Curated annotation (Swiss-Prot):
One GO biological process term: maturation of SSU-rRNA
Spans traversing the lipid bilayer: none
InterPro entries linked to this entry: KH_dom-like_a/b, RbfA, RbfA_dom_sf, Ribosome-bd_factorA_CS
Gene Ontology CC annotation, any one: cytosol
Pfam families per the UniProt record, alphabetical: RBFA
Protein name per UniProt: Ribosome-binding factor A
Subcellular location: Cytoplasm
Species name: Rhizobium leguminosarum bv. trifolii (strain WSM2304)
Description of how the protein assembles with itself and partners: Monomer. Binds 30S ribosomal subunits, but not 50S ribosomal subunits or 70S ribosomes.
Its biological purpose: One of several proteins that assist in the late maturation steps of the functional core of the 30S ribosomal subunit. Associates with free 30S ribosomal subunits (but not with 30S subunits that are part of 70S ribosomes or polysomes). Required for efficient processing of 16S rRNA. May interact with the 5'-terminal helix region of 16S rRNA.
An MF annotation (GO) of this entry: ribosomal small subunit binding
Protein family per UniProt: Belongs to the RbfA family.
Cited SUPFAM superfamilies: Ribosome-binding factor A, RbfA
Keywords linked to the UniProt accession: Cytoplasm, Ribosome biogenesis
């Protein structure tokens, strides 16, 4: 009998991802990472996705007030091993400390594009036409 697999993360992956997100946030808020770029930037961590074996944590971050996100993402990835070590002190219940990878969170940009599309005159006209038919 084979087990059905789904692409949705398990409850355990979600729970551990949230714990890792909170721990990374604390490390960054305390200013434990000594890097001029990171210290000068407000960083929002929207989500941490865990691999199924819980050995890789991909943190989706949004640097606020910075036009070039790649500079901040590169700085975070340079210090990923140090951040991983700091996580080990906070997440003692984990058997393996996950490798941390930082990626730019583009979901806000996607939401903004969708909102702009919905507010465009063409779409508004189509939506109003649908309401008239009902």
């Amino acid at each position: 009998m084979t087990r059905a697999t789904s692409s949705a993360p398990s409850q355990r992956m979600l729970r551990v991802g949230e714990q890792v997100r909170a721990a990374i946030t604390q490390v960054l808020q305390r200013g434990e990472v000594r890097d001029d770029v990171i210290e000068a930037t407000v960083i929002s961590i929207s989500e941490v996705r865990m691999s199924p074996d819980l050995k890789i944590a991909t943190a989706y971050v949004t640097p606020l007030g910075v036009s070039d996100h790649s500079v901040v993402i590169e700085a975070l990835n340079r210090h990923a091993r140090y951040i991983r070590g700091r996580l080990g002190q906070q997440l003692r219940q984990m058997k393996y400390m996950p490798e941390v990878r930082f990626r730019d969170d583009t979901s806000f940009d996607n939401y903004k594009k969708i909102d702009e599309l919905l507010r465009s005159p063409e779409v508004s006209r189509d939506l109003d036409g649908d309401n008239d038919e009902q």
